[in-house]
Amino acid sequence: MRRLPPILAVIAAVLAVAGCGGGGKDSGDGTANVPDKGGLRTKVQAAAAPKASDFPSVDGRSLQEVADSMQGGPEVGLAGQTYITGDNRLAFGVIDSQGKFVYGKTAVYIAPTPDAPAQGPFPAPADVLVTDPAFRSRQAASETDLFAAVYGADVKFSKPGNWTLLTVTQSGGGMLAAPSQVKVVKPSKDDIPQVGEAAPRVETDTIASAKGDEESIDTRIPTAPELHQESFADVVGKKPVALLFATPQLCQSRVCGPVTDIALQMKAKYGDKMTFIHQEVYEDNDPNKGLRKPLQQFNLKSEPWLFVVGADGKVTERLEGSFGLKTFENAVKTAL
């Protein structure tokens, strides 16, 4: 396999995943909605349940040595930009040379440098983005969309600095490896609200504040007025809240539409226990005008972001970039 590069040159197809930026039962993990074309559904179902034992142990090898034992070829597109020392969710897509998403049992290995001892494997289950039909927008992940799921691994970075990653996906009887790199900072250097901290009491856009002009505060097609009934400032600290920052129509990736649809599906199940709020990203829905005030108050520089906040007003989970049905639901449960 090629030498692990210090910076991954990301192809356009990868940007479709990274541009914006778990487990357990839910109202359906979505695999039944994944298209069956070309055996995709079967691949995603297998990819949803990897185990560490499905992958080679590191046995004291460096990350480069692990990579050299596998076949190269695909690229990895990270779905986030924010990583801190300690526990992190690493979300990503794996894309082949034709720009198609690769689905199979997947895991992640990490190390501070390619020549350092590898850590892992950390299983990365595929999390389905395809909602039930009743919750799909025009921007949705659908039964005809081959972008059906996103991978997510729980990893721990022990120190700040650059870290090299190696994603490994089972395909065609072999192992396909794809390298990347992330920058990790101390929590004190991350000014985005973290788990355990009080969420900023921001005024989010509502149907009332928009004087009934739903399209001015929601680029989803059709709009989702259910997610714009209450301002975050009016409910935070009184009951659990799921606050989603996303722009379905203007997102630089293909994930803002699906995550907003997932919010609607979660509201249908948990709306009696939690308030679900969607906040658009850009002033006047124009990227040239900059970010809306709530995003500035949360110190966000990418999107989508999900913040789940408990009844005490403190963040119980935060998710950046792409997240599917299981991950969203598990986040919701942290505040219930």
What are these model-predicted stretches?
Residues 1-18:
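Sec-dependent bacterial lipoprotein signal peptides
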Residues 20-32:
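Bacterial lipoprotein signal-peptidase II cleavage site
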Residues 29-158, 162-214:
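Contiguous segments within soluble domain cores/interaction surfaces
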Residues 188, 193, 208, 212, ...:
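Thiol-/selenol-based redox modules, centered on thioredoxin-like
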Residues 213-218, 224, 232-252:
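Short active-site neighborhood of thiol/selenol oxidoreductases, capturing the structured segment around
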Residues 245-248, 279-282, 320-322:
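Active-site-proximal beta-strand/loop segments in catalytic clefts of secreted hydrolases
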Residues 253-270:
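Typically the conserved alpha-helix immediately C-terminal to a functionally engaged Cys/Sec
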Residues 271, 277-303, 308-315, 325, ...:
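Thioredoxin-like thiol-disulfide oxidoreductase module
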